[in-house]
């Protein structure tokens, strides 16, 4: 647990903090550098599935570049709201309110905030993000799996996200967001794998509120 806390203490800027929160794909997919000629229907299927998520709650396991894992619960509500509630003992909370992502570190009483669109998660959360425009399909070797890499060439500083969808009749659009890989501008990779998906559940907007740990004079 001390190693987990040390990892968060070393976060020196929002991009690094964000890279801790978002990503995952299978090793076979990550190891394939070739970009396939994307079939519009496949990209459309994945985007339709993504946009079809109204609310989602799922367990996650996050793995950083050193192989250390942290678990927690993800809650998502469109448009643009997300919450990463980390396991007990991790003094960090990440919340998106539809416009910005906020990282709250309760141990050091610090808050960092940046626009959703300026991060790899923009592809997931920003309702104005044209995912299909910036998406490339990566080969998976499995017709039941779609891998989309999203990167804005005009803004490489926003990073790259690779989303993995698997065929699941119970998911919106018949494709389930299984995992994703987020790569920041410093090429730091984090992986996030989801499980126990619950779609269409009632999610109160209060879920995306948070308690400010900073002294009143510093807010």
Please describe what each predicted stretch is.
Residues 37-49:
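Extreme N-terminal tail/first-helix region
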Residues 61-63, 85-87, 104-106, 151-153, ...:
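A generic structural motif
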Residues 132-134, 139-219:
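Gly/Pro-enriched, hydrophobic low-complexity segments
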Residues 3-29:
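Bacterial N-terminal signal peptides that target proteins for export
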Residues 29-38:
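Sec/Tat signal peptide C-region and signal peptidase I cleavage site
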Residues 48-67:
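A short, Trp-centered hydrophobic/proline-enriched beta-strand micro-motif
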Residues 73-125, 190:
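An acidic-aromatic
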